[in-house]
Each structure stands twice: as C-alpha cells, then as structure tokens.
C-alpha cells in the first residue's frame, strides 16, 4: 500500500550512491498484453552505496517524502530454518520520481530473529506512515508474530495480540466507526481463518488495547463452515467473534479457539487488501489446495458494516474452479479501476505464474504479464511455475495512473547477497527483483 502525503522528519536510508541507479539485469517479468510496460528497479545482489539487496522480496509499502523522493519498504521472506543467509529482513529504499534508487539500508536486518515476513500494508497513524507485516512462520521463536514499523523513528512495535499464526498480511481498514485490522492467516490447508483486531483507534490497536476476533458465519451453513457453503452469486452473512488473548499463546491454541467458536474454515487464505474507494470492502485470496473445497482458488469480497464493524458479509468474486481463468491466487492490490492478482501455483508444472487484472467496470479478467524464470530454474523446479511475482501495490499516486510496484521471487537460482554481517557478497541466497509495471486502464 502507499500514502501520498509528504512526511517531514522521516528517517532516511544512510547508504546512498553518488547518482540514482537502476538494475542492469533484465526484467524477471514479461508482458502478455498490449501496452504493458515493465521496468526493473533493483535486483537481488545489486549494491547501492553500502547496501546490497537481499533475495526473496515480498510485501511492499511506499509513500512520498518530498517533491522528488519516495520511501519504499520491502520485505524479504527469509529464515535460517529454510537455509537462507539470514532471518527476515525489511529494506528501506529511497527512490526518485523515475523509480531509480537513491539510497538503501535495512530497517530490519535479520538479527532480530523474525522469520519469513510475507505481504505487507502501509497505513498512516497520526500523519506518520507505519508498515504492517507478520511472520509466515509459526514455528519461529516468536511463534508467528507480527510487527508495525514506524517510518519516522525507524523502530517497530511487535504485535503478537494480532494473533500467533502463519501471517500472510496485516491490513488496517479505514473508513469505519472503529479501528479494524484484518489479519489474513495462510494456515494449514482446510483450516485457515480470517481474523480481525478491533479497537477505538489504530494507535491503540498497535499497542494491544483491543480485541482479537475471527469471522463466524451466521447464515446457513453445515456443521463445518467452509467454502462448500457458498458459491458465486451467493452472500453469506457473519460476524467477528471475540477470542480471549489467553487463547492466543500459540498457533495451536488459537486454532483450537477458532474451531470452538465455529469460525469459517477457508482452504488457505493468502493476501488481503482494503478498497480505499469503498470503506469496509476487503478483497482476499483463498489460494486453494489439492483435494480441498477449492483447488484453483477463489477471490472473496468481504463487506464490513462501517457503523457496526464486527458484522460482515462474504461473497465469491472470482472462482478458479468455475469459469474464471485463475490458478492459485496469492497477492493482491486494488485501485479505483481494478484488482491486480498475482498467482503462485501449487504445482510448478501447471504453468507460468501470471499477473492478472480484474477490471471493475466490465468484470473482465485478463492476464497481463508472467514471470520469466531461467531455464535452470524451470528444470530444478520441475516446471515453468518456478518463480512467482509478489508484493504488488498501487503506485498511481507516486508515478501516475496505471503504475504498480511489485517484486519477483526468483527461486531455484543462487546469487551473491549480504550475510548476517550485511557485508555485500558475504553469502549466497535465492534471487529476486523489484519492478515498476504500467498496466493500461487500471
């Protein structure tokens, strides 16, 4: 997500080049539709001053800090437990108006012990942009925790009260009578719930002065609320039911508490995004899994009642198992005109991971780009779905209408990256790339 406001007193990256740079590497994404422009910004292994980009980039957040500069935060979904060169990191880059990188540093270095920061959301608290994200790793030492990073101070607040789980994203929703933060759980297939954290203000939510809740259907379902209970064209009413923090001491206890209150079991929730043009509307992806209620995945539309935010209705917007050309949706971003969807196929042999656009005006779904993995990556992964794009955000307020920022996770290739010391070229890890993408009519 992004914020268009200019922020005074922002903590800027310390490591700068004499002149802004863009990567010399080719784009890891290629267009599939007319008019699409793809501009690689930075590639894993690139050096900007004393900063070197790590691999496996994921969630992004960006805002304008002056008439000529843009601040970008970028997750790196890393963990020593996965044989990565460090634990989770967050890069802080300053870009110019062309998208070139002016400077870079690590806001979170990996020494903090978090694992696998996934998608992310940027929201403003009292005029200051905060970067919200969480661990997609419940077996970490923090058992699947989350953080909110203050861009003005460079310090973060750990937010375990948002739930111990496989976090896909942490999404503050604006325009409601109370603060509500959607917490998307990328959990065990068939046991994935949609959570929220409610409070009087977002600042109080950050500091744990609120209530954790899970979505429970109140409409007609069977004894096990699941995607079998809703199809395209139907609406399922529900409410967010309180879960005491004493039941949030571990992912296992939180799961048990969710089952006890009858929470809806999605197959495997991935990203979520709040629609800034429609207060209370949240789109989220259920990526699907083999031998589950949805195989190719769905996109859901959640309509939260702005005046009574604990009430929300669920609809199926897109269904890959029905007539929609979509395979395992993962990350999402939204503008006034379109919803952008990034695939992450469960089986590499099933095809390239694509960038899809759903246009609200005519309800059309179009593939506009795909990843471009190297032949060696395709061979090692067993198919063209070796690489995935991720982290997409609407960048229209930064670069103009139709512009998006996203990244590619280039698995099955190794590049030189900074190790625990942050010294450039001191380790090897998986690749990746940050890109600007222009998509017409979005």
Predicted regions and their residues:
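Secretory targeting and sorting signals
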Residues: 1-18
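Sequence/structural signature of beta-propeller domains
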Residues: 16-442
């Amino acid at each position: 997500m992004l914020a268009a406001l200019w922020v005074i007193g922002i903590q800027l990256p310390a490591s700068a080049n004499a002149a802004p740079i863009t990567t010399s590497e080719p784009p890891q994404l290629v267009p599939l539709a007319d008019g699409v422009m793809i501009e690689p910004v930075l590639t894993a292994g690139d050096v900007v001053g004393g900063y070197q980009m790590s691999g496996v980039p994921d969630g992004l957040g960006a805002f304008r800090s002056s008439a000529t500069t843009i601040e970008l935060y970028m997750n790196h979904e890393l963990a020593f437990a996965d044989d990565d060169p460090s634990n989770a990191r967050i890069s802080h880059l300053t870009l110019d108006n062309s998208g070139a990188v002016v400077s870079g540093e690590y806001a979170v270095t990996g020494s903090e012990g978090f694992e696998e920061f996934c998608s992310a959301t940027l929201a403003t608290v009292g005029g200051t942009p905060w970067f919200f994200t969480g661990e997609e790793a419940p077996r970490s030492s923090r058992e699947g925790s989350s953080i909110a990073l203050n861009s003005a101070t460079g310090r973060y607040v750990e937010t375990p009260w948002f739930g111990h789980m496989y976090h896909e994203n942490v999404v503050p929703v604006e325009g409601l009578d109370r603060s509500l933060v959607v917490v998307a759980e990328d959990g065990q297939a068939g046991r994935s719930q949609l959570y929220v954290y409610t409070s009087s203000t977002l600042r109080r939510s950050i500091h744990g002065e609120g209530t954790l809740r899970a979505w429970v259907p109140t409409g007609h379902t069977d004894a096990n609320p699941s995607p079998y209970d809703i199809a395209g064209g139907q609406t399922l009413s529900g409410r967010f039911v309180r879960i005491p923090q004493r039941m949030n001491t571990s992912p296992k206890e939180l799961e048990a508490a969710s089952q006890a209150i009858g929470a809806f079991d999605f197959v495997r929730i991935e990203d979520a995004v709040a629609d800034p043009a429609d207060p209370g509307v949240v789109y989220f992806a259920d990526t699907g899994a083999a031998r589950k209620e949805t195989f190719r995945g769905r996109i859901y539309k959640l309509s939260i009642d702005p005046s009574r935010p604990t009430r929300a209705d669920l609809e199926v917007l897109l269904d890959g198992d029905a007539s929609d050309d979509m395979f395992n949706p993962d990350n999402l971003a939204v503008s006034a005109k379109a919803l952008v969807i990034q695939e992450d196929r469960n089986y590499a042999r099933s095809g390239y991971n694509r960038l899809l656009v759903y246009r609200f005006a005519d309800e059309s779904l179009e593939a506009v780009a795909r990843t471009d993995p190297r032949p060696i990556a395709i061979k090692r992964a067993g198919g063209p779905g070796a690489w995935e794009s991720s982290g997409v955000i609407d960048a229209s307020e930064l670069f103009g209408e139709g512009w998006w920022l996203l990244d590619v996770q280039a698995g099955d290739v190794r590049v030189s990256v900074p190790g625990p010391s942050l010294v450039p070229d001191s380790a090897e890890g998986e690749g990746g790339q940050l890109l600007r993408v222009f998509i017409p009519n979005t």
